[in-house]
Amino acid sequence: MDFSKLPKILDEDKESTFGYVHGVSGPVVTACDMAGAAMYELVRVGHSELVGEIIRLEGDMATIQVYEETSGVSVGDPVLRTGKPLSVELGPGIMGAIFDGIQRPLSDISSQTQSIYIPRGVNVSALSRDIKWDFTPCKNLRVGSHITGGDIYGIVSENSLIKHKIMLPPRNRGTVTYIAPPGNYDTSDVVLELEFEGVKEKFTMVQVWPVRQVRPVTEKLPANHPLLTGQRVLDALFPCVQGGTTAIPGAFGCGKTVISQSLSKYSNSDVIIYVGCGERGNEMSEVLRDFPELTMEVDGKVESIMKRTALVANTSNMPVAAREASIYTGITLSEYFRDMGYHVSMMADSTSRWAEALREISGRLAEMPADSGYPAYLGARLASFYERAGRVKCLGNPEREGSVSIVGAVSPPGGDFSDPVTSATLGIVQVFWGLDKKLAQRKHFPSVNWLISYSKYMRALDEYYDKHFTEFVPLRTKAKEILQEEEDLAEIVQLVGKASLAETDKITLEVAKLIKDDFLQQNGYTPYDRFCPFYKTVGMLSNMIAFYDMARRAVETTAQSDNKITWSIIREHMGDILYKLSSMKFKDPLKDGEAKIKSDYAQLLEDMQNAFRSLED
């Protein structure tokens, strides 16, 4: 929000409007003489005017969590009430920017202060007032038109990827008395004036919205379109939908951040909001370094991915209280773009740090701790965040649909999934991508454990698959059966060895190895495999399962005859086919293109059928 417009202590005429600091305990400050203050009201604390939020009221005492470092605040310092809740500014200029947890623009602060640190009590508006944006009003609006909350009244081309639709804030309505002609305006210029019941109100391109409040929608819709991640194991076995909720729990070093970053880079979302919440600063700088170089092709033009991304950085060395706010800031930005009719993905890395911030504040307030010292309301807070996801019919005209998908990384200490944060999260989310330390140690990435992970969106996506990839659902079921069977056989193999297994079981083991090593495993740092389009995923799986079916049939049909076909014979005769199967992943979707990859896979299937025919003859 625009902190420069908030009242300042020096400007106040009456001292009676101040409260006074009564006690300081880390980020928690208690203040007296605060009668009339509201819950979650924004306040300025001390002579440095630090930003804080009231989290408890008792008599005329208020407990405030301060979003900045509180060293130097002393008893008796003034506390100024602003009369507003913690809010964010929504308007052109969000894309490509990097904010801290309470939406202060880090690049602007850095250029103004020439410092690598954020000074305390800094006053900078979240969206720059200097940049001029090219505003085009909607053709069907003129003076005298009626307009209501959520209606789009203008369009700003924020960059070549995002057309920023300027909407009327949800609670306003009236008759247009002025609308700005097409031209260049900054975010403080009035572009619309309305009259309602004799009262005129002016609007700029920016709207302010409280972060803890859900933005209203017309209705929630069932989600039915997959969120394609470009990771084979996720798209094929545990799909998520646009508007879904996903948790990625995993111990340190399992690759949570790499999965969230590859989602940001390659998923089929229109807008990405990446919230780094209490994680390493290096991870955010890596995103800032990598994303501008990464490109995507839109209508034949190559564009930087940074143009569709906004970052909310709240690293582990920033004040603890702001971690809690950063998650709400991120989800409010996501809902704003959803209201324009975009499909938004929000990455929260990691919600465990957010829960730890809740625990620290709760401990300072001397609240009764629950499991592992987390507050009793941990589950409710997590739910209030995850339930803001979903596919919706947006408010206002023209009619449009948008969605917010949330992907939350969870880092349980020691990779223990019975941790309170993980278990509370799993009760809320619909998709669980469980990362396995053992797989990560074997350098099998993405280290998603295919036996414990699940997705509850399978049924919802059946219609989509039937329409576009008819053969896919039975293939997925078969692949899961093979992997499950291999897990059951693993114990027997350890006891008696591979040689004493039945021939069909040997085939199951070999095909499971093929699926694990050459389908589920994916090298995110190579041009051919960092992103796998869905047609390639289906083609690869289809050929592997076809090989499995043919091999089993060949073994079973000749089991009673004199010239038996065993697995060793198949392996001997089909070394070339097996090599081709395991190198299907090396086809580069950008260089080779969809048509060539599909024809290559079809050719491989034909070669396989011919090879099995000649073997049986």
Curated annotation (Swiss-Prot):
It is found in: Cytoplasm; Cytoplasm, Cytosol; Cytoplasmic vesicle, Secretory vesicle; Cytoplasmic vesicle, Clathrin-coated vesicle membrane. GO terms for molecular function: ATP binding; ATP hydrolysis activity; proton-transporting ATPase activity, rotational mechanism. ATP hydrolysis occurs at the interface between the nucleotide-binding domains of subunits A and B. ATP hydrolysis triggers a conformational change in the subunits D and F, which induces a shift of subunit d. The c-ring is subsequently rotated and results in a continuous proton translocation across the membrane. One of its GO terms (cellular component) is endosome membrane. It catalyses: ATP + H2O + 4 H(+)(in) = ADP + phosphate + 5 H(+)(out). It is a peripheral membrane protein. Its main location: cytoplasm. GO terms for biological process: ATP metabolic process; cellular response to increased oxygen levels; endosomal lumen acidification; Golgi lumen acidification; intracellular iron ion homeostasis; intracellular pH reduction; lysosomal lumen acidification; proton transmembrane transport. Keywords: Acetylation, ATP-binding, Cytoplasm, Cytoplasmic vesicle, Disease variant, Epilepsy, Hydrogen ion transport, Ion transport, Lysosome, Membrane, Nucleotide-binding, Phosphoprotein, Translocase, Transport. Changing D371G: In IECEE3; uncertain significance. ATP binds at G250, A251, F252, G253, C254, G255, K256, T257. It comes from the Eukaryota. Its EC number is 7.1.2.2. Changing K256Q: Complete loss of interaction with Rabies virus protein M. Changing P249R: Found in a patient with severe developmental disorder; uncertain significance. The modification Phosphoserine is found at S384. V-ATPase is a heteromultimeric enzyme made up of two complexes: the ATP-hydrolytic V1 complex and the proton translocation V0 complex. The V1 complex consists of three catalytic AB heterodimers that form a heterohexamer, three peripheral stalks each consisting of EG heterodimers, one central rotor including subunits D and F, and the regulatory subunits C and H. The proton translocation complex V0 consists of the proton transport subunit a, a ring of proteolipid subunits c9c'', rotary subunit d, subunits e and f, and the accessory subunits ATP6AP1/Ac45 and ATP6AP2/PRR. It is linked to Cutis laxa, autosomal recessive, 2D: A form of cutis laxa, a disorder characterized by an excessive congenital skin wrinkling, a large fontanelle with delayed closure, a typical facial appearance with downslanting palpebral fissures, and a general connective tissue weakness. Most ARCL2D patients exhibit severe hypotonia as well as cardiovascular and neurologic involvement. Belongs to the ATPase alpha/beta chains family. Catalytic subunit of the V1 complex of vacuolar(H+)-ATPase (V-ATPase), a multisubunit enzyme composed of a peripheral complex (V1) that hydrolyzes ATP and a membrane integral complex (V0) that translocates protons. V-ATPase is responsible for acidifying and maintaining the pH of intracellular compartments and in some cell types, is targeted to the plasma membrane, where it is responsible for acidifying the extracellular environment. (Microbial infection) Plays an important role in virion uncoating during Rabies virus replication after membrane fusion. Specifically, participates in the dissociation of incoming viral matrix M proteins uncoating through direct interaction. This is V-type proton ATPase catalytic subunit A. The lineage of its organism: Eukaryota, Metazoa, Chordata, Craniata, Vertebrata. The gene is ATP6V1A.
